[in-house]
C-alpha cells in the first residue's frame, strides 16, 4: 500500500531543495511504496520539478535584504518572514489535503510544520541549525530572540529533527553528515558531455540575488588573469543574469549542478551548504566567499579558511587552487539520514 506524504521545502535559495531532492531519491530507492508531493515556492519549485518530482506551488519565502554582497539589517527579513508565515499558513489550511497525505517531511520550511503539528500529522524536519544568530543591531536582536524562542517551542513537538550543525541535546534531535545529490556519471564522461576541454572554473551564485557581487568579481578576476588554458562557466541562478564574455560561458539554471561541480577543476561559490558539500564530495577544489554578515555562510566559509574580504584576492586564489589538482572526496551522510527518516516513517506512519 502506498504511503503518501508532503515534503515541504524552504524556498529561499536552492540549498534546501537540493538536499530534499537527494533525500527523496534515497528514500524512494529503499522504499518504492513512498510517494512525495513537494510543497515549494520559487526558485526551489523549479529545481524540484526538473528532478522529476510532483510539486504543489506554495508561497515563496523572502530573500535577505542586501547590497553589494552585504546583508542589511535583518529585522526587515524577520518582519517579512512573519508575514510569509501568515500567508503560507492560510494557504496550507485551504489547500492542504491532510487526510490523504499521512506525514510531513520538511527541509527548513516552518509554516507546514506548524500546520502538521496542529493536525497531529507525523512530522520530521531537516535543518542546518535549530536557531538563528544573524542579528547585529538591537531591533534585529529583539525579533531574532523572540523567533528563536518561538521556534524552540515548536521544534520540541516535532517527531524527528535531523541537524547538520551542532544542536541541543533534545531527544528528537539527530546529527547528520553532509547531504549531496549523487553524480550521474564518472568525471571524465561528464567532461566529455559538457565539452570541457580546458581547465574549468565553475562560478555559482545560488538561488537568491545576493550572489551578484561574487559573479561580477569572479568574471573580472578571470579576465584579468588571461588564462589561455582555462575557461569559466557561470551559473547565475534564477534571480540574476550574467553576460557572456570571451572564455566565459553563462547559464541561468542547471538542475544537475552537482555534475558540473564534479566535472569542474575549481568551484567558486557564496558558501551555501549545498554547493560546498557537493564540491567536497566531488573532490573539487573550492573557493567560498560568503556575503558579509550572513552568519551561516560565513561559518561555512571559515571552516575552509575563507572570509568575505577574500573577494579582493580572487586572482591569487584562482591561480593557487587551479594548481593543486583533485582532492580526496569527503564522505556524504545520505545513508545515515535516510535510515533515520525510514525509522521515523515505520514507527510513526506505519500504523496510521
Q: What spans do the regions from the language model cover?
A:
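Active-site proximal beta-strand in glycosyltransferases
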Residues: 117-134
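Conserved nucleotide-sugar donor-binding subdomain of glycosyltransferases
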Residues: 71-106, 110-111
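C-terminal amphipathic helix plus adjacent low-complexity
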Residues: 320-352
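A nucleotide-sugar donor-handling region in carbohydrate enzymes
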Residues: 141-209, 237-239
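Donor-nucleotide binding loops and adjacent catalytic segments primarily
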Residues: 24-26, 187-266
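A donor-sugar binding/catalytic signature common to diverse glycosyltransferases
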Residues: 104-107, 125, 256-299
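A short, glycine/small-residue-rich beta-strand->loop->alpha-helix junction that serves as a flexible
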Residues: 8-21, 209-213
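Conserved nucleotide-sugar phosphate-binding/catalytic loop shared by glycosyltransferases and other
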Residues: 4-5, 11, 34-85, 311
Amino acid at each position: 500500500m502506498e504511503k503518501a506524504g508532503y515534503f515541504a521545502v524552504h524556498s529561499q535559495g536552492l540549498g534546501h531543495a537540493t538536499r530534499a531532492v537527494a533525500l527523496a531519491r534515497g528514500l524512494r530507492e529503499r522504499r518504492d511504496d513512498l510517494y512525495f508531493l513537494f510543497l515549494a515556492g520559487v526558485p526551489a519549485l523549479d529545481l524540484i520539478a526538473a528532478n522529476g518530482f510532483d510539486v504543489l506551488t506554495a508561497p515563496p519565502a523572502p530573500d535577505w535584504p542586501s547590497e553589494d554582497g552585504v546583508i542589511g539589517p535583518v529585522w526587515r527579513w524577520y518582519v517579512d518572514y512573519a508575514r510569509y508565515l501568515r500567508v503560507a499558513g492560510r494557504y496550507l489550511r485551504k489547500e492542504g489535503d491532510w487526510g490523504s497525505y499521512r506525514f510531513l517531511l520538511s527541509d527548513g520550511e516552518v509554516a507546514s510544520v506548524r500546520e502538521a503539528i496542529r493536525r497531529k500529522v507525523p512530522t520530521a524536519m531537516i535543518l542546518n541549525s535549530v536557531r538563528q544568530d544573524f542579528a547585529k543591531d538591537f531591533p534585529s536582536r529583539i525579533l531574532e530572540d523572540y523567533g528563536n524562542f518561538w521556534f524552540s517551542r515548536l521544534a520540541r513537538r516535532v517527531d524527528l529533527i535531523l541537524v547538520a550543525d551542532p544542536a541541543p541535546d533534545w531527544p528528537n534531535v539527530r546529527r547528520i553528515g553532509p547531504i549531496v545529490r549523487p553524480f550521474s556519471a564518472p568525471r571524465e564522461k561528464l567532461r566529455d558531455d559538457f565539452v570541457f576541454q580546458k581547465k574549468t572554473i565553475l562560478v555559482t551564485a545560488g538561488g537568491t540575488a545576493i550572489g551578484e557581487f561574487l559573479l561580477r568579481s569572479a568574471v573580472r578576476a578571470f579576465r584579468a588573469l588571461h588564462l589561455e588554458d582555462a575557461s569559466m562557466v557561470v551559473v547565475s541562478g534564477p534571480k540574476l543574469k550574467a553576460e557572456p564574455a570571451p572564455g566565459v560561458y553563462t547559464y541561468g539554471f542547471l538542475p544537475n549542478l552537482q555534475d558540473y561541480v564534479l566535472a569542474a577543476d575549481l568551484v567558486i561559490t557564496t558558501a551555501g551548504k549545498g554547493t560546498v558539500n557537493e564540491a567536497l564530495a566531488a573532490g573539487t577544489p573550492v573557493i567560498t566567499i560568503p556575503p558579509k554578515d550572513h552568519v551561516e555562510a560565513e561559518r561555512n566559509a571559515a571552516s575552509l579558511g575563507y572570509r568575505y574580504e577574500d573577494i579582493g584576492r580572487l586572482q591569487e586564489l584562482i591561480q593557487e587552487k587551479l594548481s593543486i589538482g583533485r582532492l580526496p572526496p569527503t564522505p556524504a551522510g545520505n545513508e545515515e539520514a535516510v535510515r533515520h527518516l525510514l525509522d521515523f516513517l515505520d514507527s510513526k506512519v506505519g500504523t496510521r
